Amino acid sequence: DGNLDLITVGKSGSDAFTDIFMNSGAPDYKFVADWDMIEAFPGLSSESNDNGSKLLVAFDYNNDGWTDLLINGSAGGVWEEITGGTGQGRVCAIMKNNHGTFELLKNPVDGTENFIGVNGGSIDVADFNNDGWMDILVTGYHDEYKSITKLYKNNGNDTFTEVTGIDFVGHQQGETAFIDVNNDGYADIIEIGRDVNNGWAAFGKLYINNQDGTFTRHEEAETNFFGGGCALAIGDVNNDGLNDYFMTGWNTNATFMYNNGDNSFTKQELIPDDARCRGGSATFVNIDNDGF
């Protein structure tokens, strides 16, 4: 209808919720809870204050012009079971928008399986192979596989296929995101968090898109960034045409990482430690309209 609606997820006390508010439009622009839609969703949370909090991404996975939703986190109950879980309450799923109503996309992985349910990590979307379809990046903790990172390629037919052969670490308490590091028009991947499979060691990894459906870990970039319980914001901070990023978490200072243009970053701790947080989120926005 041309009006932006609102979705909130998280915990209130001990109860997890997913609430949807519809924008009434002009002249009042009131947000009214849509209980029919709310009942279609599980209540979602990150489960712990140390965990990542990116539980929801809005995107159009099937290019039909309607905004779908990718969700992950702790849900439990019947919802966790129908998305292929094993009783630990972890969910990763797509809610398909059918002209204003939502339903679960069943068996999205090759038409036979569900996404691996995780919590404590993050989700992101981008068209990593430039075929016109949005792909999915999922990371977090699973009771059987421990910390994992998975990339799913969108096949354009309501199914996704896992992209294998990438030397992901997998993590909890962090964030994994798409970022075009080298301005070649292909989305690379940055992975920052704590490796549950390796004594909860904090780490940061950069994976360069080879433009052929594969990625190569860029070892030289590893020593410059790491963190736990972190949140990422990606953008061109200094207007040099290169994507930088900001990182904050309980295991690291609030830090800007400036893109050097050679698949490496330089750390700049330019803001007070008051910006340091855990289990939160960060974003860039031009508040004063000065071009930065």
Predicted features along the sequence, with ranges:
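Short glycine/acidic-enriched loop and turn motifs that connect beta-strands
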Residues: K11-D15, A75-W79, Y141-Y145, R194-N198, ...
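Beta-propeller domains
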Residues: H171-A177, I192, V196, F225-I234, ...
